[in-house]
Amino acid sequence: MVSSAQMGFNLQALLEQLSQDELSKFKYLITTFSLAHELQKIPHKEVDKADGKQLVEILTTHCDSYWVEMASLQVFEKMHRMDLSERAKDEVREAALKSFNKRKPLSLGITRKERPPLDVDEMLERFKTEAQAFTETKGNVICLGKEVFKGKKPDKDNRCRYILKTKFREMWKSWPGDSKEVQVMAERYKMLIPFSNPRVLPGPFSYTVVLYGPAGLGKTTLAQKLMLDWAEDNLIHKFKYAFYLSCRELSRLGPCSFAELVFRDWPELQDDIPHILAQARKILFVIDGFDELGAAPGALIEDICGDWEKKKPVPVLLGSLLNRVMLPKAALLVTTRPRALRDLRILAEEPIYIRVEGFLEEDRRAYFLRHFGDEDQAMRAFELMRSNAALFQLGSAPAVCWIVCTTLKLQMEKGEDPVPTCLTRTGLFLRFLCSRFPQGAQLRGALRTLSLLAAQGLWAQTSVLHREDLERLGVQESDLRLFLDGDILRQDRVSKGCYSFIHLSFQQFLTALFYTLEKEEEEDRDGHTWDIGDVQKLLSGVERLRNPDLIQAGYYSFGLANEKRAKELEATFGCRMSPDIKQELLRCDISCKGGHSTVTDLQELLGCLYESQEEELVKEVMAQFKEISLHLNAVDVVPSSFCVKHCRNLQKMSLQVIKENLPENVTASESDAEVERSQDDQHMLPFWTDLCSIFGSNKDLMGLAINDSFLSASLVRILCEQIASDTCHLQRVVFKNISPADAHRNLCLALRGHKTVTYLTLQGNDQDDMFPALCEVLRHPECNLRYLGLVSCSATTQQWADLSLALEVNQSLTCVNLSDNELLDEGAKLLYTTLRHPKCFLQRLSLENCHLTEANCKDLAAVLVVSRELTHLCLAKNPIGNTGVKFLCEGLRYPECKLQTLVLWNCDITSDGCCDLTKLLQEKSSLLCLDLGLNHIGVKGMKFLCEALRKPLCNLRCLWLWGCSIPPFSCEDLCSALSCNQSLVTLDLGQNPLGSSGVKMLFETLTCSSGTLRTLRLKIDDFNDELNKLLEEIEEKNPQLIIDTEKHHPWAERPSSHDFMI
């Protein structure tokens, strides 16, 4: 053996630092390592009596120096003498590396430049693995760690299996806390993976399985558990080989061959590479953290290669494997965050996608019970987390559950109130951070370093800190020791030399901390911080689109602007918040101030303001809103309720309550499920009550629209109480597609006798219990409704009869919209009877898509003769045809008829119908506006209409002919008519094939004409220079004429509908 002088560090000097008790413990621990079988030959009495110097002589005489060094380092760590371990590592680094490289060849062509030399920490981890896998021969029994193989020496496959098993057992230590619930979760998802499910038989084709989900939910744990199952021969589908490829580690490699990529950690298998790869059907590849590969756009599909000996960039090699150009028969399992799914969809052939959702609610509850031990404390803490929907959602990540439990348990033990801690995620994370260090620790520099690392990583879209990154930023690994001990950082157990944050959400919190802390003077001169910008850049809409991980950091930035939290941080770390942070946040680039916003922008802003818990800040921001549109789920209702009640200038509010995430939405028959839904409801009701209180407190709030929403009985009750109150001043109310069915009925009753409501739309109710409630509203003597929209509702003939009678009684309604209802013959006749009633004051009526036929038009024509008030009628999307038009024209000819606007959009009208309309328009008719859009009137129909336009008695002011199949040669007739017409103000020729010649003819006519036309709509070729020049000439000579070149599509809202309903 070797002398002590040949060791890489002075072990004797280190042992002299130990007390007598510590030296005895060192002796005991070092003799427990089975690898040093030579130690077994040494009498224990010699070891027991030896002092430090004698012990070193014994060890170095009988054992290999590499073993003595690694074992000693491990013993020092077990004794918690990290000072001695670190000191030894500094001395042994170079010597140990040389020693290790003599014993282990370099990996398959990966040079030192391509792969950095192993550090002593990495050597120590490998030593632990090798120590467990060490083989000892005794007769015909071979021992491999704790495994026993009878009859023969283990082959390379068995040895590799055991090393992998040892490696992946470490996964249960990769996050703080117990692992029982993690294992339960892993077993649950394993049944969804074909090659780990006993019910799925092996098929002729290999599987590609993609596990996807947000960060920290257990994708890597599940992948590593699969590897462990393979190593222990517990995988249902038997693979001879399995390889674990960590993209976190691979992202640091330069170009290499596929063989070098896969076998870089298995140099002992390099002679068998061709044999192994030839058995692709028996190989499982686990590609973990695909989103961490950091490949440039297009890199994965560029230069795809099937040659496993050819050097290529790592993304190309993985892309070739996923695309099944490389080893097409191998089985693949990939884990990724959702952001990389697009690339996978392009690459992978018919993958099976499995969404990993982490801890279910029962998992979280079980975890809390095990962590606390005391059931009362556990359930109190669990309910506190559950009361904050955003925090509860984060709790699907095991690490977040551990943070919550650790923080709240400590507070309860101290007798502190944990309720404020769970109010916001910022409050919880700050309390957790401060609880890991004593107050007054003055760790200002260390915290700023950590927050800088978090920000750098978040901008790079990684939670991993590589040793090279630390060196580039001037950070020593020893600087991270405090945060490793505090469980804020974790050392990666697969990719050595890497560190990661406990969870992405905590990294986002630390990033926000970097931007909100007051800068030190030396930082202003430090160039390496500028590449991640300031708060303005962090909250930039453009940057958040590029990197969605920044969004939550923006939330936490607002949360850290809270003065109480700033004091807590200063007391612990000696750090101060920037005094200008609030003003910087107010200047941020969230583009939804003043009401001009997308729903996503607005929800982000409300979430940010809620995190701040600063009412003055909220009031200042929300005062700018006059209109607001909220999409609410269990998470968003909390910040929305907190902020909207401070919208003192709000005039209009739109709500969409998402069914999937709010209370009472989960269908279940079991009684415990009913209880659970009731508990959900109780958590959410206070916030909903706060939100609805604005209807009674804000006298300027006049408009409410609730669309596509699920409202439980409790939510409806609270809403009804608020809108029925005397202090509610709503004028326009819209309820569209609200479930369950009885919600419409209850909301209608809440409006009964409401004096200020003048506009009401009810849409999408398929139950018949709403009509009696609506009739009550209409009959009430204090009803002031002027507009009623009853759209797409189901009703019986008797209910249409009741509604017709209510319309006769009502004295306020002037406009009724019955679109998309099946009136049929009986319903139509009942309505016509009402329209004939002398006390019916309806002026505008829409019967769009009510399944009316030409026969209904005969009765309707009679109504037009006797009705004293009806001025607007819409019959769009009813197949009345030419015969129906003929009947209508008979009624319109009577001088008693008051109708001014008639909409016949898409009514199966042809040129024959235009002939009857032409005869009507040539007489002195009351009709001023006519919409014939989407009817095939063609050349002949257009000729008839132009004939009418030429007549001096034609009073038509608006003519809409969108999509009427008008060809270019009809433009000659039209130009002639426009030249002499003195009444037409609006003409719509959109979506007609007028051609360049027809449009040119129209433009030339308009250039010379001094007629009454003020709005012309048509489609032109944007690239026709001649037409564009004529258009400019018209605009110059006739600035009052507006020419709409149809940049938008009118299907969503017809032009005629603008003037139809109030």
Curated annotation (Swiss-Prot):
Induction: By interferons and bacterial lipopolysaccharides (LPS).
Domain Pyrin: 1-94
Tissues where this protein is expressed: Expressed at high levels in lung, placenta and thymus and at lower levels in ovary, intestine and brain. Highly abundant in oocytes and early embryos, however poorly expressed in somatic tissues such as brain, kidney, liver and spinal cord.
LRR repeat feature ranges: 812-832, 841-861, 869-889, 898-918, 926-946, 955-976, 983-1003, 1010-1033
Binding site residues for ATP: 213-220
All residue ranges annotated as the NACHT domain in the record: 207-526
CDD domains membership: Pyrin_NALPs
InterPro entries from the UniProt entry: DAPIN, DEATH-like_dom_sf, Leu-rich_rpt, LRR_dom_sf, NACHT_NTPase, NLRP_HD2, NLRP_innate_immun_reg, NOD1/2_WH
Disease: Oocyte/zygote/embryo maturation arrest 18: An autosomal recessive female infertility disorder. In affected women, ovulation and fertilization proceed normally but embryos are arrested at early stages of development or cannot establish pregnancy after implantation.
Name this polypeptide is given: NACHT, LRR and PYD domains-containing protein 2
Organism: Homo sapiens (Human)
Gene: NLRP2
